[in-house]
């Protein structure tokens, strides 16, 4: 299954807020009833499916990519769900998003693909690059790179930077301090339901 490129509002209308996918939010209407779920019981399969879809759309993954991460998480020590979230949060495209260098994960992916980003002074053009503690993230010293990221930073609230990261606005430099803790995950998600969804596929 390919990466979703359709209307993003359609997705958040069905799944709720997905800050990694879009900055748009839906205003709730008083008295509004979701006709697709009213007057009928929602199956456990559908509940698990929607949690999985939240994860996939928020982090901008294909179905194959997400399944690969689930398999890696199952082989690692610790809670499969929490390891899965850590793997996704430490992707370079997501780190750029959490630092405010991009307003969405798709926007961050473009920055990486267009070679605007340096890790420890080396150019990295792989959005799925696994960032590690002590990694230093900077941008190429060229006007176009500076302009794009400065514009994004001006729209970002510095208070949103999670504890496992730090950002120097003057130097436009990010630092990975440590692996992310569960409490700093931005997406509202029940990762256990995602693991259960994939239980027969891994």
Swiss-Prot record:
SMART domains: Ribosomal_S4, S4
UniProt GO BP: ribosomal small subunit biogenesis; translation
Compartment list: Plastid, Chloroplast
TM stretches of this protein: none
Cellular component GO terms, alphabetical: chloroplast; small ribosomal subunit
Residues covered by the S4 RNA-binding domain: 90-154
Disulfide bonds listed in the record: none
UniProtKB keywords: Chloroplast, Plastid, Ribonucleoprotein, Ribosomal protein, RNA-binding, rRNA-binding
Main subcellular localisation: plastid
Family, per entry: Belongs to the universal ribosomal protein uS4 family.
The protein's name in its UniProt record: Small ribosomal subunit protein uS4c
